[in-house]
A protein has these predicted regions:
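PLP-dependent aminotransferase-like
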Residues: 96-147, 151-153
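Active-site phosphate-binding strand-loop segment of PLP-dependent enzymes
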Residues: 130-188
């Protein structure tokens, strides 16, 4: 029998790849995962408790995940996705609407599809540094959240940028609106020198992907539930629906180890090595864009697209998180004493990259849709293709997703505006890859 996965990984690992991407253990060079033993991959035998009705060691382990006294921690073995789905489902029978940001993770939209409910899309602000969605436009937030049963925010964004989550949560709480914060990329927040976690804002539900920035196994996340959160019993019930009936003890144990790492972490060495890395990146001619989260670096090269930079890095077996037309994104390790991360080798390989001197190319800035909108769940049965320029006031029958960054810009069920048509034409005219548009045509609801 052919073994394509086994063979590929064996081949890949022989090249000694260096990780500047998730997961946070960075090819098992960060943290304490050497304490894991595959013999721990067991089932719920006597003494090992049950994640779906924890009364023993699993309950005690989760009680030890203390980041804020007002929250209880719940292990997620099906990723942050399972936590998001559970919270959305937990509010499905309540009156009112869901309200959310446009840069929500796809699991939010999947949750709305499963509940067959629509959502208000908030007006958005755009980052001047990265040209990505930053957060909601806070100038008239209170006017947009009327009759909201659950508000959903992404903090930080994928590129490591933060908005005023404290003010945002305060506005929602004063209006009596429950809040879910997708803090997938902020499990390390709260460490010295890093942004504050939204756990300090009183949000009702905060979900963190420990595996993205802390040293735990992929798919291991934690849902933090406030002691006064509405619908908490419902949400806890749905955690059993959206997670495997055979939860992995390896994943749960890795969460315990990662949290122990977090509680003991001293960030001084991290910032020393980060400074040295930034110096080398600048020395070889790259531009370093620093953002709110020190763990993320956005890198640009004069005359290079992000995709070209990615190829140059990969030629030296350095693997980054993502590339777009203008930059690449690095996710740094949480360096610590006794880590085995190949830092000196990374610097050597970076110095080996041969950058040609190029004239600066015109940046291809994707324009974002920032206006208020509505996301409609459910399937659209009758559809037809139509030229973009004839689509104003029609109903989109599919999502419009430019790649990268792979964020849904326009949503199935939205009414097409003149601004949307302008954006779609801009993307097509600049040869950007956009899922949902082909040869200046899109799918609309046939009415």
């Amino acid at each position: 029998m052919p073994k394509p996965l086994t063979n590929k990984f064996n081949e890949f690992l022989r090249q000694s790849p260096i990780s500047l991407h998730v997961p946070g253990h960075k090819n098992m060079t960060i943290g304490q995962l050497e304490q894991l033993d595959f013999k721990m991959d067991m089932t719920e035998i006597t003494g090992l408790d049950d994640l779906h009705q924890p009364e023993g060691i699993i309950l005690k382990s989760m009680e030890g995940i203390s980041k804020h006294p007002d929250y209880e921690a719940y292990y997620l073995v099906n990723g942050t996705t399972s936590g998001i789905l559970s919270v959305i489902q937990g509010f499905s029978e309540q009156r009112g609407k869901y309200t959310m940001v446009r840069n929500a993770h796809k699991s939010v939209f999947h949750g709305l599809e499963l509940t067959c409910q629509n959502a208000l899309l908030l007006e958005m602000d755009i980052s001047l540094k990265t040209n990505q969605y930053l957060g909601p436009d806070l100038s008239n937030l209170r006017d947009q959240i009327q009759d909201t049963k659950l508000a959903i925010f992404t903090y930080p964004n994928y590129y490591g940028e933060c908005f005023d989550i404290s003010y945002t949560t305060m506005q929602l709480k004063e209006a009596g609106v429950p809040v879910l914060i997708d803090e997938a990329h902020g499990a390390h927040f709260g460490l010295e020198g890093f942004p504050s976690s939204s756990l300090n804002t009183g949000a009702d539900y905060v979900v963190q992907s420990y595996h993205k920035s802390l040293p735990s196994l992929t798919m291991s996340s934690i849902l933090f539930i406030h002691k006064d959160a509405p619908q908490r019993k419902n949400v806890i019930k749905y955690l059993t629906y959206f997670q495997s009936s055979s939860p992995s003890y390896l994943l749960m144990t890795s969460l315990e180890l990662a949290h122990d790492f977090y509680k003991k972490y001293d960030s001084a060495l991290f910032f020393d090595k980060r400074y040295e890395l930034i110096s080398i990146l600048k020395q070889i001619g790259l531009e370093v864009i620093e953002v709110d989260d020190p763990l993320k670096l956005n890198i640009r090269g004069n005359g290079y697209t992000g995709f070209e930079l990615q190829k140059l890095f990969e030629m030296e077996n350095i693997y980054i998180e993502l590339a777009d037309n203008n930059q690449i994104l690095l996710v740094l390790p949480l360096w610590h004493e006794e880590d085995t991360y190949p830092f000196e080798l990374l610097l050597e390989r970076l110095k080996s990259i041969n950058f040609e001197k190029r004239k600066a190319h015109k940046k291809t800035e994707i324009e974002y849709l920032t206006e208020k909108g509505v996301y409609y769940s459910g399937e659209i049965d009758k559809i037809r293709n139509i030229n973009i320029n004839k689509s104003v006031n029609k109903i989109l029958a599919t999502h419009i997703v430019p790649y990268p960054p792979g964020i849904t810009f326009m949503f199935k069920g939205e009414k097409i505006t003149e601004n949307m048509v302008k954006l779609m034409n801009y993307w097509q005219d600049n040869n950007l890859r956009v899922e949902g548009i082909r040869n200046h045509k899109i799918e609309i609801k046939d009415e």
